[in-house]
Amino acid sequence: MAAALRSNTSRETASLTLSHFRYFIFNRIHTARTATSPPHCNHRSKSDEKFPYKISSLGTSFLDNRGGGERRNSTKCYAAQKKLSGVGSSVVILSSQGDPPDLWQPPGDGVSVRVNGSSVNLGRGGGGGGSSPGGPGNGTGSNSKEDCWGGSNLGSDFPTPKEICKGLNKFVIGQERAKKVLSVAVYNHYKRIYHESSQKRSAGETDSTAAKPADDDMVELEKSNILLMGPTGSGKTLLAKTLARFVNVPFVIADATTLTQAGYVGEDVESILYKLLTVADYNVAAAQQGIVYIDEVDKITKKAESLNISRDVSGEGVQQALLKMLEGTIVNVPEKGARKHPRGDNIQIDTKDILFICGGAFVDIEKTISERRHDSSIGFGAPVRANMRAGGVTNAAVASNLMETVESSDLIAYGLIPEFVGRFPVLVSLSALTENQLMQVLTEPKNALGKQYKKMYQMNSVKLHFTESALRLIARKAITKNTGARGLRALLESILMDSMYEIPDEGTGSDMIEAVVVDEEAVEGEGRRGSGAKILRGKGALARYLSETNSKDSPQTTKEGSDGETEVEAEIPSVVASM
């Protein structure tokens, strides 16, 4: 019995000695790790607070788990240290949650850092690339790319509707009503975002014990998307592009005809947001205040009711897929722009502050409007649409007047679903450009087509000259082709093709090309072999040409700012009157 007691006592003594040894080793390891860790990594987990240096029967496995936990914490601290490399100040980790991924990335919103008393969020924020504050990258630092964007960041310096409209006038000819409506809509949109962000900041700065504002003061403003309707070449895309450039926000153009419902061959609607994120240089905060222009929405109308039972994945299906995105929701966008995958990485983008502008030609919608107004027939049932097809100018004028009275019911009758139309409270109709407006498009804007081609010829030290009658004839041809301003470039390319082939070859003396002249004869011969712009060779050739034309009975004056030929001006009223 005594031997058994002595044996038990010796075993207990050995076990106690082993426990003390384990405690000693663990304490030494922990002390060494604490001494060598950065100052901001000296924090204890919840298990440390509950069981400080406690060795249980788990033995070695417990130490392994603790070591794994410490490795995870040290990895997180290394991430924060790498994030703030080069910052000569004390850093204190306020909170740290979750395990790091297999491949290290910048810490998420769960890590908050205090630098010299000020709080800094190490989250990816606007698509940060892991750079330190003040360094290059797209994080949320003071020198990040978010600061270079406009929108609500302009605050009280955001341009007024009159200033926006004035900026549009420098690039867009005509469409005065559309420019006014768009200016007001864009101004209200970004004023709403700035108001909400300022309210959140003021709410965060006030003390929690302070009295909360009344419910009447907390009014949530909703955005107003825009739907542009007008013939091709009337300036729909140019208006949206110029607006985004003027307010300095990310802008992307999407084609509705390439979109399909999720799960079918084609592009998902989420691909639009990925393109916007790419334009914003993966700055999520900037992308969430961008402008998205979806073109050709009139091509995704519902298909006619028929015996075909197949699903309309490129028509009504696309409209259904766009509904929540247009209204405002958090969309999971695939990180690499591919289709959604259950195990793929996604980027969350909130669309409630993204301004969506949709555009379409809506061909023949004036017939639907005319039928709604009960003026589709006159007398004994003679259709108005037959008279509309009789002449070009009258057709465009009647269609423009009818488009100004378009209503939501007309769009629904055209093929858009009511839910889709309801997401666009601002309806803007654009009219077809007139002959004089097309002449202005050629000469007046900052990026006028005439100025573009003159710059191109100037690169080869050649002057490009347009006569007034040539410009007017080019505008008339564009109206005849029913392509609007888009048809002007095609006409100029055809007229100037032969001269652009010749001018790169530099000549000397009398073979030197000094100027190229586009007159009425060159425009009339457009498309015929051997015709086109006149090539003037030799020094002083342009001056001699101008002197010869001025000596004729009906002088041809030069391009911008001139009144043009009197007989041409007299033809316009007679043409309109005959129609």
UniProtKB/Swiss-Prot annotation:
Binding annotation for ATP: 231-238
A Pfam entry, by short name: ClpB_D2-small
Subcellular location per the Swiss-Prot or TrEMBL entry: Mitochondrion
SMART domains for the chain: AAA (SM00382), ClpB_D2-small (SM01086)
Swiss-Prot/TrEMBL keywords: ATP-binding, Hydrolase, Mitochondrion, Nucleotide-binding, Protease, Transit peptide
Main location: mitochondrion
Region (Disordered): 99-153, 197-216, 546-579
Keyword Endoplasmic reticulum found: no
CDD domains in the record: RecA-like_ClpX
Record-given protein name: CLP protease regulatory subunit CLPX1, mitochondrial
Organism: Arabidopsis thaliana
